[in-house]
């Protein structure tokens, strides 16, 4: 376990939420390769995606790194007609995080957050710790409670995926 804490870790510490911290070489940018580097099931390592709805509201979705976000399912979960990925250049000003280091924990503003229901198949899942090269492992229930997330079916092999 690493001693160099990110803001996301400090926030969990403040709420006494149990997690483990892991590092990997920051030049590894592919989520499936990150899972392999950690020696973990790629279905248990989640990426954080930020979208905007047709109503102009932002929503956050956490899905396995080996899966794609089904935009229709995401819109349904968010109660919107449609959702679209934000532009990469909008990510840091909006969330405080850069691409590859976006955590669902500790964004500049609290956005509605949804976690793919498959997370409930694991006692613990991995999410970004808020810095490229850092991951943290925690209970999906603890993550959902902390960020106010709802579990929903968010992935499929549909054509409209990201």
Region spans (language model):
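Extended, low-hydrophobicity, polar/charged segments
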Residues: 1-162
């Amino acid at each position: 376990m690493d001693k160099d804490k990110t803001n996301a870790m400090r926030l969990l510490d403040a709420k006494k939420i149990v997690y483990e911290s892991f590092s990997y070489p920051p030049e590894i940018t592919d989520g499936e390769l990150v899972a392999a580097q950690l020696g973990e099931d790629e279905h248990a390592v989640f990426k954080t995606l930020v979208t905007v709805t047709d109503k102009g509201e932002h929503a956050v979705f956490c899905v396995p790194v080996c899966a794609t976000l089904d935009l229709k399912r995401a819109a349904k979960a968010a109660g919107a007609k449609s959702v679209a990925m934000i532009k990469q250049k909008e990510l840091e000003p909006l969330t405080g995080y850069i691409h590859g280091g976006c955590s669902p924990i500790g964004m500049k503003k609290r956005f509605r957050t949804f976690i793919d229901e498959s997370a409930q198949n694991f006692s613990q899942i991995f999410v970004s710790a808020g810095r490229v090269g850092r991951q943290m492992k925690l209970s999906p229930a603890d993550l959902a409670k902390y960020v106010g997330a709802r579990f929903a079916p968010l992935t499929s092999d549909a054509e409209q995926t990201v």
